[in-house]
Amino acid sequence: MGDVPSPLWLRTTDVDHMRRDGRDEDPGHAWTSERIGALYPGASCSLLDCGVMSGVTYAGLRDAGLPVDYTGIDVSPRVLDACRAEHPGARWLEMSVTDLAFGEGTFDVVNSRHLLECLPYYETAVREMFRVARTHVVIGFFQVPRAPEALLRRETDEGYIWLNRYDPGPFEELLHRLSREVETADLRHGPRRSRIYLCTKR
């Protein structure tokens, strides 16, 4: 996001709130760790995590014993400070997914979870993730794509926040144009549904 995060944005990216909200326990984290482990058995891989939340992806990869060279990015200094304090062994950088300061094919895997819903739209971010990925892109949604598309920009006195639901048709068409294979997993955690796309880059 090109805008400076508003106070509302900072509150809604609060690390403790994410844990209370149950996002840390979502089965998508374990699914992603298992698939990455299967794709790179016994080998190290480099991974860029876009929108790090509470650092849960890094923790899941570490707890699974995967030798991942991890870099996490987020637009929120508050989130990054919390991640640095809790996980000093990883790299945490302030950066927007729509303007990644890395060269083409820098990372074996590029991952994002519950990030694209919070952007004004997804295409720039998706193309940037594919640009810097060498082999795989993983995209997870808590706001599962379905028609009709709903682009929700919630205005407040303190700024705004997006919570979009995308039409799966155009979104998945973009993924297939950029990928030679797209694997989809639909998961459930209590009442919450999530969807993960695991893309193998062309």
Functional labels for PLM-detected ranges:
Residues 1-41, 44-53:
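Conserved class I S-adenosyl-L-methionine
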Residues 54-99:
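Class I SAM-dependent methyltransferase SAM/SAH-binding core
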Residues 111:
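A conserved beta-strand element that flanks and buttresses the S-adenosyl-L-methionine
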Residues 114-118:
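Short catalytic micro-motifs in class I SAM-dependent methyltransferases
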Residues 119-128:
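A short, conserved alpha-helix within the catalytic core of class I
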Residues 134-143:
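Conserved beta-strand signature within the Rossmann-like core of class I S-adenosyl-L-methionine
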Residues 161-179:
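Short alpha-helix
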